[in-house]
């Protein structure tokens, strides 16, 4: 029987323009420095299809002509487009297949994975209705203290990045 390797997942959730992408960039930079092979998945929650990466290129033409899956590879980089009804479980399987060590997900607010919530305003926490929160990151200058036993960090605090990385590496924070 094959052993299933652990595959830590952490979600970063928050409202639009709350700073999710900037925070994720900081995590990715530090993970890269530490040799962690971190996958990153973003949910396009704004309606419609995401913008194409290959506008007007051959793979875009293949897609327009009816291909369900197109890809282009060069210098070890693969760009893949697949027209399917993707559920999160299937996307996670894809990242595992690609042999990443762990996965950082932006969005998919209702998914059951451990979440770091990015807040512009304290009131956003209740409005998000997120479950399985492991930490809160706030952006305002005013100091926010612990919330219901959860660790709370300012967005500029490097310890916030360390906390998320420890979760992704399967370490206790």
From Swiss-Prot:
GO BP: any one term: Mo-molybdopterin cofactor biosynthetic process
Keywords: GTP-binding, Molybdenum cofactor biosynthesis, Nucleotide-binding
GO MF annotation list: GTP binding
Domain of life of the source: Bacteria
Chain residues that bind GTP: 17-21, 51-56, 99-101
InterPro entries, alphabetized: MGD_biosynthesis_adapter, MobB_dom, P-loop_NTPase
Pfam family membership, one: MobB
NCBIfam families in UniProt: mobB
Homology family: Belongs to the MobB family.
General function of this protein: GTP-binding protein that is not required for the biosynthesis of Mo-molybdopterin guanine dinucleotide (Mo-MGD) cofactor, and not necessary for the formation of active molybdoenzymes using this form of molybdenum cofactor. May act as an adapter protein to achieve the efficient biosynthesis and utilization of MGD. Displays a weak intrinsic GTPase activity.
Protein name: Probable molybdopterin-guanine dinucleotide biosynthesis adapter protein
Name of the gene this protein is made from: mobB
């Amino acid at each position: 029987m094959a052993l299933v390797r652990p595959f830590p997942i952490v979600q970063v959730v928050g409202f639009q323009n709350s700073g999710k992408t900037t925070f994720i960039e900081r995590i990715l930079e530090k993970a890269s420095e530490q040799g962690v092979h971190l996958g990153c998945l973003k949910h396009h929650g704004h309606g419609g299809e995401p913008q194409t990466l290959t506008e007007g290129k051959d793979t875009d033409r293949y897609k327009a002509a009816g291909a369900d899956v197109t890809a282009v590879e060069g210098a070890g980089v693969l760009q893949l487009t697949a027209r399917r009804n993707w559920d999160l479980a299937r996307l996670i399987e894809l990242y595992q297949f690609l042999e990443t060590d762990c996965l950082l997900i932006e969005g998919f607010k209702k998914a059951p994975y451990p979440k770091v919530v990015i807040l512009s305003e304290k009131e956003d926490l209740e409005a998000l209705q997120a479950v399985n929160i492991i930490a809160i990151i706030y952006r305002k200058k005013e100091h926010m203290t612990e919330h219901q036993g959860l660790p709370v960090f300012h967005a500029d605090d490097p310890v916030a990045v360390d906390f998320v990385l420890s979760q992704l590496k399967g370490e206790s924070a």
